[in-house]
Amino acid sequence: MAKSIPSAGLRLRLRLRRNARRRSRKSTRKIPKGVIHVQASFHNTIVTVTDVRGRVISWSSAGTCGFKSTRKGTPFAAQTAAGDAIRPVVDQGMQRAEVRIKGPGLGRDAALRAIRRSGIRLSCIRDVTPLPHNGCRPPKKRRV
């Protein structure tokens, strides 16, 4: 017996129903604990929220929040980016988090303040800025 081919309208409805199912399953995932990574450079601040295994749940940066050029490096931009990255995970039920801050930028403290204000309990705040152990050889001294 041959199957009948569904009409275009029916195919579209089936596809939409399948996509709706996928989306709803992803948003209902509860994440009780996570890790918040703050990368603060002099020119931008990037905030990434992951679960304990390291899978990215949400991220934001000063650039994606609408700040351009030199304003991306400001503390206010970092605060906005942190709030923007944390809002979806608070809705998903995150209660505790560990914060890892990397970089020398101005947005370090502002992002941390925004994270504290969000209502997530912080279990640990760790500075993971890479430091050289006498890294590369400096250029030779300039003779004038």
UniProtKB/Swiss-Prot annotation:
Give one GO molecular function term: rRNA binding
Q: Which domain of life is it from?
A: Eukaryota
Question: Where can this protein be found?
Answer: Plastid, Chloroplast
Q: Does the keyword Transit peptide apply?
A: no
| Assigned keywords, A-Z | Chloroplast, Plastid, Ribonucleoprotein, Ribosomal protein, RNA-binding, rRNA-binding
Q: Name one GO cellular component term.
A: chloroplast
What are the BP-aspect GO terms? translation
Q: Name one Pfam family in it.
A: Ribosomal_S11
InterPro entries, sorted = Ribosomal_uS11, Ribosomal_uS11_bac-type, Ribosomal_uS11_CS, Ribosomal_uS11_sf
As for family, the record states:
Belongs to the universal ribosomal protein uS11 family.
Subunit and interaction comment: Part of the 30S ribosomal subunit.
- NCBIfam families assigned to the protein according to its UniProt record, in alphabetical order: PRK05309.1, uS11_bact
Protein known as:
Small ribosomal subunit protein uS11c
Record organism: Oenothera argillicola
